[in-house]
Amino acid sequence: AHHTGLPYGRVDVGYLLDHAALDAAGRLAFRAKALRAAEHLLLCRYFDYCQVVYQADVVGFEWLLEDVVQYVLEQGTWRNLDKDSVYEMVAKGQWAAIDDMCLMAKISELRGDMGTPPHVQEKSKAIIDRHPPVLLGSAERIGQLRDGWLSDTKTGLDAMVDDLTRKLRIDRAFWKVWTRGQPWASVGGKTEEKQDRRWITILRSDVASERIQEAPGSIMSVLGDRQLDMLRVYLLPPASTCDVEEARRFIDDYLNSRLGSA
């Protein structure tokens, strides 16, 4: 939010830094005076995710890039990019050669290489031509933190896409079921251990602290056990396939039924 200029104000980073401290466990925390500024940071970050990071075309292109880069790595174009290999390439002055231009040149080669699998060819072409995949359907809801709705709905979507794959005779590699659960009160983290370290913490005294959603009177005390559940189904139609409306209808009906039962 501080850098994108999105219309919900600027985070007072300086004020937050002025009130940063360590709690008894040595974790970064903010003094109670900075509670509202910290909540503003979380709200801005939440909307930043929704409007920028999780924007529909951005997510679609990320899927294409991930799949194409994975294919390039599997073909041995570059060595395994583990830590030791990267250190070795840096030492030999080779790492600088693997940049955006190098990757785009490789993707351009894949687009015209008849030995490339069709789905990789199509994805490479879409990246070069800047044509995002088709968004067949999407759903969002604010629900309880990790209540199972997201995973259950994804399971149903995966089964439906498998059926549509057979019915429409479009390879499964052209489809993507994308999900994300974005908590309001957290700044990220995938595992419980990492998640615990990444909660914003507020000092109650000189050393004692509590997570921001436990602070009395905080907005996050209401939103702390909530998350935004997001689901999307993408399709990159092969060149020979144009009609995707049948798939769109099936997916919309399913997602609407799931939202109605939430």
Q: Over which residues does each language-model region extend?
A:
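Histidine-centered, transition-metal-coordinating active-site segments
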Residues: 1-262
